[in-house]
Design a protein with these regions (language model features):
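Conserved core of the sugar-phosphate nucleotidyltransferase
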Residues: 110-188
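Conserved N-terminal catalytic core of the sugar/cofactor nucleotidyltransferase
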Residues: 1-7, 15, 33-100
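PLP-dependent enzyme catalytic core of the Aspartate aminotransferase-like
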Residues: 579-611
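Conserved N-terminal alpha-helix of the aminotransferase class I/II PLP-enzyme fold
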Residues: 267-316, 320, 335, 339-343
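Conserved alpha/beta core of the MobA/IspD/sugar-nucleotide pyrophosphorylase nucleotidyltransferase superfamily
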Residues: 2-5, 164-244
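Active-site C-terminal subdomain of aminotransferase-like
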Residues: 259-260, 436-523
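Active-site phosphate-binding strand-loop segment of PLP-dependent enzymes
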Residues: 361-415, 430
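Conserved PLP-binding catalytic core of the aspartate aminotransferase-like
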Residues: 531-562
C-alpha cells in the first residue's frame, strides 16, 4: 500500500513549440482532461493519499490544480531551466516519507500499471512495457536477477532489451535518498541528468528491479506526432481496458448500504495479511484518526471501531455509556430511536422514553420538561431519523441535555460524513456511525466517536457487554494498535479508500451534491403530484419518505422491479398505519442519476394513472 506519489513536472515541454509556451505540457488534454489531472485521478483511485508535484515552467497551473485536489502538494524547482527531471525530483524528496510512486507528468497510461507496482513485493521497481514503436523509446537492460543494469535511448548500447521505460516507478525512501546524494555530489558535471540514469547508478549497490507488462497500454507525449498517436492509437486501448474493469453500476436509493465507487470496491483486493501485523495496525490507527477528524478535534475525541453494523455501534454506545446506577432518557421519533430504547431494555438499563411525532419536529419545551423532571445521567437521540428523513435539531437538544448534567449519546449513523458535524460545538459526547452510509465504504465496520474525557470515566465501570465494550476496546487499541478480536480486514482497506475520497470531495461539497439530488427529487415529486411525509424545512436532504398514491393500481413490488431493471434500487417504508416508500441520497450518487430515476418514477406513475 503506497501512500505517496511524486510527479515530476518541471520541464519546459519545448518540443511542442508554441503550444506549451504559456502552459505546461502536462495540461495538454486527452478526451477533455489534462494528462496530469487524469494521472492525479488514477493515483487517488489507487489509494495514494498525498501527491507531490515538482513544478517549474508555468507552475501556476499546478498550484491551481492543488486547489481542486486537496491531496496535492506543489514544490517548485526554481532552477528548472538548468536542470532536468532529477533536479525536480531532488526538491520533492524531502517531502517523501516512505515508499512512493514516481511519475512523469506527460504520461497517458492504463491504471493497471499502478496496481502492478503496488502488488510487487520488491521495494524498488521500474515499470516497463514491451515494444512500443513510439520512436522515443528508453531501453532497459537487466541482469539475470531482473535488476536494472542499463538505461539508454540508444538501443545499440543495450545488450539485451528487457523492456521499455514507461515513466512510472516505485522507490523506497532509502533509495530516493541515495539518488539525491548522488546528484548532490555530482551536480557540477551532471546538472541535467535524468532520474532514470541515476536509477542505474544506484542499482549497482541497491537493486531496482524491472517489472515488465508486455502489452501495456501507455505513451509519453512529447510532441505533436506523439499527441496524434496518443489520441488515435493509445487512448482508445486504455479506455477500452479500463471500461472492461468497471463494475456494473447499481444506484442504491435505499438508506444504506450506499452506492460505492469502483475504487472503493477494488480497494478490497489486496494481499492477504494477518491483522496483527504492525502494517495493518498502522492502517487502523490512521483510519481511526481520520474518522475522528471529520467530526471532532482528535486531541479531545477518539474513535473506537468494531467489526459490526451501525446498530452494533449503537449497542456499544448504549451498553457502555450509561453508568451502573445511571438512568437513560431516549427520544423515540422513529424506528431508530425506538431501537436505542430497545437496546437499553435488553441490558436492563433504567430508561424513560420521550415519544415524539415521527414526521413533525420535536416539542422542545416538552422535552426539556421531561429532562428536568427526573435525575437522568444519560441522554440518547438519533440525529437523522432514517425512517422518515427527519433531522432532529441537536444544536438545541444536546446543549439542553448538558444543562441538566447528562452525557449525550447520539446515533449519527445517517448523518456522519454527509453533512458538516462539529461534535464539540453540538455538545455530543458519543456518536455512533458506520462504514457503509455517507462515508461511502463497505458494510462491516461500526464505530463510536468518543469524547476522551467522558470515555475515561468508564474505566472502572462493570462491563455489561464483552465484545462491544467501548472502554475495553479503546484501551486495547491504544496499547496495541489492534482490536481485541479479528477485524474485517478487507473492509478496512475499502474504508481507507472511502476516507481518501471523502477528503478529496470534502463533506461540505458532498452535502451540496446530496442537496442537489434532493432538490431534483422534490421538484419531480411535486410535478408528479406525490406528497412527502415530512415538511421540506424539516428534512435532512438524505432520505425522503413519500406517501404512496391513493390508487389500487399502485404496487410497490412492481415499481421496485421496474426501477431495478433500469439500475436503481428503491426501498419501502411503513410507519404504523402510514404507508410510504423512501428514496435516499447517499453514497456515490450523482445528480444526473437522480434525474434519470425521477424519469423512471414518472413513467411508472403515469402507467398507473397518477400523472
Amino acid at each position: 500500500m503506497i501512500r505517496q506519489a511524486v510527479i515530476m513536472a518541471g520541464g519546459l515541454g519545448s518540443r511542442f513549440g508554441g503550444r506549451t509556451k504559456d502552459m505546461p505540457k502536462g495540461f495538454i488534454e486527452i478526451d477533455g482532461i489534462a494528462m496530469v489531472e487524469r494521472s492525479v485521478q488514477k493515483l487517488i483511485a489507487a489509494g495514494v493519499e498525498e501527491i507531490i508535484i515538482g513544478t517549474g515552467h508555468c507552475y501556476e497551473y499546478y498550484d491551481g490544480l492543488a486547489e481542486k485536489y486537496h491531496c496535492i502538494r506543489t514544490v517548485r524547482n526554481e532552477n528548472y531551466q538548468n536542470t532536468s527531471s532529477m533536479g525536480t525530483l531532488e526538491v520533492c524528496a524531502p517531502f517523501v516519507k516512505d515508499t512512493a510512486i514516481l511519475l512523469e507528468s506527460d504520461l497517458l497510461y492504463d491504471s493497471i500499471g499502478l496496481f502492478a507496482l503496488d502488488n510487487d513485493s520488491r521495494k524498488n521497481v521500474i515499470l516497463a512495457s514491451g515494444k512500443t514503436n513510439s520512436e522515443d523509446e528508453v531501453y532497459l537492460e537487466t541482469d539475470e536477477n531482473g535488476v536494472l543494469s542499463g538505461v539508454s535511448k540508444n538501443k545499440a548500447e543495450i545488450k539485451n532489451v528487457a523492456g521499455e521505460l514507461v515513466g512510472i516507478s516505485k522507490v523506497s525512501k532509502e533509495f530516493l535518498n541515495k539518488m539525491v546524494d548522488f546528484y548532490d555530489k555530482t551536480r557540477a558535471e551532471n546538472a541535467k541528468i535524468d532520474y532514470e540514469t541515476v536509477f542505474k547508478k544506484i542499482a549497482k549497490d541497491d537493486p531496482i528491479y524491472v517489472h515488465k507488462i508486455e502489452y501495456y497500454a501507455w505513451t509519453e507525449i512529447d510532441d505533436e506526432a506523439m499527441l496524434t498517436r496518443a489520441n488515435t492509437l493509445i487512448y482508445p486501448r486504455i479506455k477500452e481496458n479500463e471500461e472492461l474493469r468497471k463494475v456494473q453500476r447499481e444506484v442504491l436509493l435505499n438508506p444504506g448500504p450506499s452506492t460505492t465507487t469502483d475504487s472503493v470496491k477494488y480497494a478490497q483486493v489486496v494481499k492477504d495479511i494477518c491483522p496483527r501485523e504492525l502494517e495493518f495496525g498502522n492502517l487502523m490507527e490512521k483510519v481511526s484518526e481520520d474518522l475522528t477528524s471529520f467530526v471532532a478535534n482528535p486531541e479531545k475525541y477518539t474513535t473506537v471501531m468494531f467489526g459490526c453494523s451501525g446498530t452494533g455501534a449503537d449497542e456499544a454506545m448504549i451498553s457502555s455509556c450509561v453508568p451502573p446506577d445511571g438512568k437513560l432518557l431516549v427520544v423515540d421519533n422513529g424506528s431508530y430511536g425506538a431501537r436505542l430504547a430497545k437496546i437499553a431494555s435488553v441490558y436492563g438499563i433504567e430508561t424513560d422514553v420521550f415519544k415524539s411525532s415521527t414526521y413533525e419536529p420535536i416539542d422542545l419545551e416538552a422535552l426539556e420538561n421531561q429532562m428536568k423532571s427526573k435525575k437522568y445521567t444519560t441522554f440518547a437521540v438519533v440525529y437523522h431519523e432514517t425512517t422518515t428523513g427527519l433531522l432532529n435539531p441537536l444544536e438545541k437538544i444536546c446543549p439542553m441535555a448538558k444543562k441538566y448534567g447528562m452525557t449525550t449519546v447520539c446515533d449519527i449513523v445517517s448523518a456522519y460524513a454527509g453533512m458538516p458535524i462539529d461534535m464539540e460545538k453540538l455538545q455530543i459526547d458519543f456518536g455512533a456511525a458506520t462504514s457503509n452510509k455517507h462515508i461511502g465504504g463497505m458494510a462491516g465496520i461500526g464505530f463510536v466517536v468518543c469524547k476522551k474525557e467522558e470515555l475515561l470515566k468508564q474505566k472502572d465501570w462493570p462491563m455489561r457487554n464483552y465484545y462491544l465494550n467501548l472502554f475495553d476496546q479503546y484501551k486495547y487499541f491504544e496499547e496495541t494498535k489492534q482490536t481485541r478480536f479479528t477485524p474485517p480486514v478487507q473492509t478496512f482497506y475499502a474504508l481507507r479508500q472511502a476516507i481518501i475520497e471523502t477528503k478529496q470531495e470534502t463533506i461540505e461539497k458532498r452535502f451540496e451534491r446530496f442537496t442537489e439530488c434532493w432538490k431534483i427529487l422534490v421538484n419531480a415529486l411535486k410535478e408528479i403530484g406525490l406528497k412527502m411525509l415530512v415538511k421540506e424545512e424539516n428534512q435532512s436532504h438524505f432520505i425522503t419518505a413519500i406517501l404512496i398514491p391513493e390508487t389500487p393500481a399502485y404496487d410497490f413490488n412492481k415499481m421496485h422491479d421496474f426501477a431495478r431493471g433500469q439500475g436503481f434500487t428503491i426501498y419501502p417504508g411503513k410507519l404504523g398505519n402510514i404507508d410510504t416508500f423512501r428514496i435516499a441520497n447517499m453514497g456515490d450518487i450523482k445528480p444526473e442519476e437522480m434525474r434519470r430515476f425521477t424519469g423512471i418514477l414518472k413513467e411508472y406513475m403515469k402507467s398507473i394513472g397518477v400523472c
